[in-house]
Amino acid sequence: MAFYRPDPAMAARLEAALDGLDADGRPGLRNSLAITWVRYDDAAPEAGQGRGASWNQDRILYPASVVKLFYAVAVEQWLQRDLIPESDELRRAMRDMIADSSNDATGLVVDLLTGTTSGPALHGERWELWTQQRRLINGWLQSLAWPELEAVNCCQKTWGDGPYGREKMFYGADNGNRNGLSTVATARMLEAVMTGAVVSPPACRRLQGLLRRSLDQKQRRADPENQVDGFLGEGLPEDALLWSKAGWMSQARHDAAWFQASEQQPPSFCLLYTSD
C-alpha cells in the first residue's frame, strides 16, 4: 500500500503518456522508466494526503546523486540525537552536496554519519567493524518502519571516477552492494521533508532551503549544472516554485521534483528514474 491514494484519472494520464512514447517510435522506452507522481488538494498538505499514480515505482535502481537527499535527512537526524557535532564545515558540505551535488562534500558527510573513512583495503576485524559502521544509515532508514524503504540500500559514497581500495571492496565483486532506491521510496522521503514529517519541522525547513531551485533563466545560464535544465524543472514557468534533487550519469538521468504554481496553489511532485 503506497503512502498516497491511487487516482484512476492520474493513472490514465500517465498510461497515455507512456503510450505516447510507443507512438513516437520508442516502444521499449517505457520499460526503462520508473515513475511516482503525486498531487495534493491543499496548498500546505500534510504527509499522506496525496493522490497519485505510478509506473515501476518499486523497482530498485542505482539512484546516482538522488541518494544525497537521504544523507541530508540523516545529518539532521544525527544532529538531533547529538551523534555528530554541529559545525560550519558540516553545513557547508550539506549545502554543496544538495545545491551543487558535490561528490567531495558527500564523501565528508558519509564519513561523519558512519565514522568511517576511505583508504586502502582492510581485513579481518577492522574490515568487519568498518562495514558494520557503513550500514548505520540503512539501519536508521529501517527504523522508520516505512514499507517503501524495505529494499533500499544507502551506504555508499558517490563518485566521479569510481571507488578504490576499501570502497571498491565494499561495492562487491559484481557491484551488488551499490546504492539502490526506488521512486516510491524516494517519493516518501521527499514528501516527508516537504511536509515537515521527518526528524522535526525546523530540520525539514532547513532541508527545504537546500532543495530550493531558481527558475530564473539568467541564473540557470550562469550554472550549466543547475539541476533544472535537462530535468523536470525545465518545463516549469519562471514564476513557479521548485524544490528538487537530480541525479545523472552516463547511463541514466533521475529527478525528484516538488513544485507549485504559486504559494497559494496545491503542490505536486514527480519522481522519475531512468535506466539503460
What are these regions (language model features)?
Residues 2-22, 27-32, 89-184:
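Active-site-adjacent helix/loop patches that line small-molecule binding or acyl-intermediate pockets
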Residues 13-55, 259:
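A short, well-structured edge-of-sheet supersecondary motif
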Residues 61-84, 97, 269:
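Active-site SXXK
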Residues 73-81, 111, 188-195:
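Short glycine/serine- and small hydrophobic-enriched flexible loop segments
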Residues 77-96, 106, 200-203:
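Short, well-structured active-site flanking segments
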Residues 160-220, 265:
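Penicillin-binding protein/beta-lactamase superfamily catalytic region
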Residues 224-259, 263:
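Active-site Gly/Thr loop motif
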Residues 273-276:
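Conserved small/polar residues in nucleotide/adenosyl-binding loops
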